[in-house]
Amino acid sequence: MFQKVEGIVIRTTDYGETNKIVTIFSRELGKVSAMARGSKKPKSRLASVSQLMTHGHFLIQMGSGLGTLQQGEIISTMKEIREDIFLTAYASFIVELTDKATEDKKHNPYLFEMLYQTLHYMCEGVDPEVLSLIYQTKMLPVLGMRPYFDTCAICHQETDFVAFSVREGGFLCSRHAEQDPYRIPVGEAVHKLLRLFFHFDLHRLGNVSVKDSTKKQMRLVLNTYYDEYCGIYLKSRRFLEQLDKFQI
């Protein structure tokens, strides 16, 4: 059976001297993998369409196991991302998180649209670190996690938030922050932005400017929470951390 899908390449794996296995997150099927035979040859008709982060239409011969990529038509190569090492690093984090957080052939058009929109914004020049924070926040419910972003994790009141508790699973107000000695102190902007990112429609993203100190706190909160509850190891996250040391 042949299936035509719109999708984005989120992972490629070399297979032999000339082949690649491409993993595509598609609008129609969710995550699907297929053998792209001969795609490592420069003159192959599958060479360009099987590149990481390529957005296109793909014709896949489906089977009980691994499918075969028959042909593809590029919609966007995301060249703005490919030409910038920092954009590539953040985009790699986003597609790897998508890959690690999803199962094969689980239809999720909402997630496809979120992935596409995030990479599209990145190509348009929106702050890639902010986009990665938004994406990481919005992936929480996909992974079955819902931290207390709206109320204090202990008293469940909407009040002044001064810290984030991984142990309690959310923000803590000033009255209960002392109950977790390992709490992460945060500024008011961190709470407001994480709550906003969790709930808002990504299509409505306008001009966004976030202080570096706020982004750093948000990253600490999210990474620590993911490490405790998710158990996903991302090579791209380590690469990002190394790149950040050299970014001016």
Swiss-Prot record:
GO cellular component, one term: bacterial nucleoid
Keywords, sorted A to Z: DNA damage, DNA recombination, DNA repair
Domain of life: Bacteria
Gene3D superfamilies: Nucleic acid-binding proteins (2.40.50.140), Recombination protein O, C-terminal domain (1.20.1440.120)
Single biological process term from Gene Ontology: DNA recombination
InterPro entries xref list: ARFGAP/RecO, DNA_rep/recomb_RecO_N, NA-bd_OB-fold, RecO, RecO_C
Its job: Involved in DNA repair and RecF pathway recombination.
Matches recorded under PANTHER family: DNA REPAIR PROTEIN RECO
Family according to the record: Belongs to the RecO family.
Official protein name in the record: DNA repair protein RecO
Organismal lineage: Bacteria, Bacillati, Bacillota, Bacilli, Bacillales
This protein's encoding gene: recO
